């Protein structure tokens, strides 16, 4: 479809890995593949509907030509075929209208599903952020470019990862005058 070679695809994956990181790259790939599948489905639906419309239009044109040739002058066999053409054209028209009605509802449902999915992912991401990160994100999103926003998000992820293993020290600093030197403790134990 896009005529992308293996080397170009590999380059895109490496850039995606660098920009998004190993945690978010699979999620991004799944999201993009979902969009591609949705777009392909919509394109095939449109293509099928166009084909049916063209067939219907051709049938209607042939019917009009037959009517112009004066329907009574035709032989009985030809009049039967014209009637059959009219009946098949009417069947195709009703089927096409039903499919169009069904497609409109399914398209609306698909759009709602995609919106709900994006809203739920954004809500889970904001729930995971601390209030200070939310304030920082809210103030910087308006000013930063998408690349800078991605970099900032990556830095925030790294900070969350670091804070998991190295929690902040909330204790007050201990001064050297309050701590006994270890050499005195060792000497006291020997004595």
From Swiss-Prot:
One GO CC term, this protein: TAT protein transport complex
Gene3D superfamilies linked: 1.20.5.3310
Topology of this chain in the membrane: Single-pass membrane protein
Main location: membrane
Transcription found in the keyword field: no
Segments passing through the bilayer: 1-21
Positions of the UniProt region annotated as Disordered: 119-139, 168-191
GO biological process entries: protein transport by the Tat complex
GO molecular function, one term: protein transmembrane transporter activity
Keyword Transport set for record: yes
Cellular compartments annotated: Cell inner membrane
InterPro entries, per the entry: TatB
Biased composition (Polar residues): 119-138
Keywords (A to Z) from UniProt: Cell inner membrane, Cell membrane, Membrane, Protein transport, Translocation, Transmembrane, Transmembrane helix, Transport
Biased composition (Basic and acidic residues): 181-191
UniProt record similarity statement: Belongs to the TatB family.
Assembly and binders: The Tat system comprises two distinct complexes: a TatABC complex, containing multiple copies of TatA, TatB and TatC subunits, and a separate TatA complex, containing only TatA subunits. Substrates initially bind to the TatABC complex, which probably triggers association of the separate TatA complex to form the active translocon.
Free-text function comment from the UniProt entry: Part of the twin-arginine translocation (Tat) system that transports large folded proteins containing a characteristic twin-arginine motif in their signal peptide across membranes. Together with TatC, TatB is part of a receptor directly interacting with Tat signal peptides. TatB may form an oligomeric binding site that transiently accommodates folded Tat precursor proteins before their translocation.
Name this protein carries in UniProt: Sec-independent protein translocase protein TatB
Organism this protein belongs to: Pasteurella multocida (strain Pm70)
